[in-house]
């Protein structure tokens, strides 16, 4: 049975951890879905790990839709969420409705994710959810604000910053978000947020007290040339693939592949 947004909330109530990962193509999405991942996010992180951009900022709505269509063809069980990229929702609720509507209509995804929880974004979330578009929030370190942050530092360390993030979490929950991504914040702040909101919190670099965890699949598979300190590679595919290609190349050059026909 396919995972739903309501099911995630039920799992929070039961204390059942939520497993989430990113995917950007058909093959990886199929593997994740078959492995029983609960939530698959087509993140705008694809700009950095798949398209080669330095940040997520250049990613377009068309690029998100293109990759999300491929993922949708593979996913049968997991809940599929797609990021709204930079400047496709910040201008107005109407812009957000148009962008989110395109994603749901053209890709078949069940929900969208957007960053920040300030007053304007909370109102946008309220508008989206009021017309039936499920929204996942994302607070703490929000990559679309990389230049404002001056990089990717941990957020919420100062008391005023911690209070602001908590306020954003409460506002997004009140606005109707079905879940929150908490990125790169202190574990005690993530714990406080998790205890105070009725919707699931999905941590990425936010400690062990969240209702679930998410990582970029390239980091999990050891494909990234750099990964954040909170990521954990479970295999080193970067090395494995490089070695496999070198062996293939050597066999071709020595005419060992393909094998000549037997006499």
Curated annotation (Swiss-Prot):
Its main location: cytoplasm. Transmembrane segments: none annotated. Its EC number is 2.1.2.11. Keywords: Cytoplasm, Magnesium, Metal-binding, Pantothenate biosynthesis, Transferase. Coiled coil: none annotated. It catalyses: 3-methyl-2-oxobutanoate + (6R)-5,10-methylene-5,6,7,8-tetrahydrofolate + H2O = 2-dehydropantoate + (6S)-5,6,7,8-tetrahydrofolate. One of its GO terms (molecular function) is 3-methyl-2-oxobutanoate hydroxymethyltransferase activity. It holds the Pfam family Pantoate_transf. 3-methyl-2-oxobutanoate binds at residues 44-45, 83, 113. Its cofactor is Mg(2+). Belongs to the PanB family. This is 3-methyl-2-oxobutanoate hydroxymethyltransferase.
């Amino acid at each position: 049975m396919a995972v739903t947004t309501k099911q995630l909330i039920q799992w929070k109530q039961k204390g059942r951890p939520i497993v989430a990962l990113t995917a950007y193509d058909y093959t990886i999405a199929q593997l994740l879905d078959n492995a029983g991942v609960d939530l698959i996010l087509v993140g705008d992180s694809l700009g950095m790990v798949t398209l080669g951009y330095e940040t997520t900022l250049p990613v377009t709505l068309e690029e998100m839709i293109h990759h999300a269509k491929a993922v949708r063809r593979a996913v049968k069980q997991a809940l599929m969420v797609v990021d709204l990229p930079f400047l496709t929702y910040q201008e107005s609720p109407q812009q957000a409705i148009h962008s989110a509507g395109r994603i749901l209509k053209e890709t078949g995804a069940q929900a969208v994710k957007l960053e920040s929880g300030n007053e304007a974004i909370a109102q946008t979330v309220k508008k989206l959810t009021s017309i039936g578009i499920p929204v996942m929030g994302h607070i703490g370190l929000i990559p679309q604000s990389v230049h404002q942050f001056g990089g990717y530092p941990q957020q919420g360390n100062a008391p005023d910053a911690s209070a602001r993030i908590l306020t954003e979490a409460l506002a997004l929950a009140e606005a109707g978000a079905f879940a929150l991504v908490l990125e790169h914040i202190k574990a005690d702040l993530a714990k406080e947020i998790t205890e105070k909101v009725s919707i699931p919190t999905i941590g990425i670099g936010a400690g062990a007290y969240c209702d679930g965890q998410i990582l970029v699949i390239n980091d999990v598979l050891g494909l990234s040339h750099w990964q954040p300190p909170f990521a954990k590679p479970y295999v080193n595919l970067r090395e494995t693939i490089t070695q496999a290609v070198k062996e293939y190349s050597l066999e071709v050059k020595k005419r060992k592949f393909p094998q000549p026909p037997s006499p």
